[in-house]
């Protein structure tokens, strides 16, 4: 892309998992449900939808909206949590956001009119040399107007799992198990 510098850093690993809801059982996501997390342009559009979460492997509880500087042997990680609540009827909306919501951070409850669905979490790990981290020589976004802000981290998801598979995922999550 124009005004980009450097090259693409490929992930060392990617973990995709579904998580339950702290308050209620989850229902299966409908096929083709669309979800967004984060915002590609929070500098120009404002921070309301930004959800950047960065950490280092082995430091899961230390989350930041800044690029981390990890200790030697630890990987830089992007943690992307998608909404875990759904309006129960729409697989998309005009803004691609209002048909889904995040659970309340304090109570874990979905907003009124929403039901809990398996919450998708994607953890992307990168092997980035510590000296590169210390010099601030890695960046994420490719939008010049965002100044390579780590706060612009974002992702899109469309559920293409079969109905049968989503029923299995919901049952597994509701039973509190880790399922392959």
Tell what function each PLM region has:
Residues 1-80, 87-180:
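Primary mode marks residue(s) on the alpha4-beta5-alpha5 output face of response regulator receiver
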């Amino acid at each position: 892309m124009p005004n980009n510098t450097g090259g693409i850093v490929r992930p060392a690993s990617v973990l995709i998992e579904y998580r339950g809801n702290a308050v209620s059982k989850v229902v299966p996501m409908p096929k083709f449900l669309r979800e967004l997390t984060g915002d590609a342009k929070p500098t120009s559009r404002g921070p309301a939808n930004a959800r950047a979460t960065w950490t280092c492997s082995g430091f899961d509880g230390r989350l930041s909206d800044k690029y981390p500087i990890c200790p030697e042997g630890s990987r830089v990680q992007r943690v992307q949590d998608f909404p875990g609540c759904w309006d129960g009827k729409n697989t998309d909306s005009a803004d691609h956001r209002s048909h889904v919501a995040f659970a309340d951070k304090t109570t874990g409850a979905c907003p009124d009119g929403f039901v809990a669905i398996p919450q998708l979490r994607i953890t992307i790990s990168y092997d980035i040399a510590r000296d590169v981290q210390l010099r601030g020589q890695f960046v994420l976004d490719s939008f010049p107007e965002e100044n390579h802000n780590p706060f612009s981290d974002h992702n899109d998801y469309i559920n293409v799992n079969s109905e049968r598979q989503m029923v299995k995922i919901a049952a597994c999550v509701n039973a509190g198990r880790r399922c392959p």
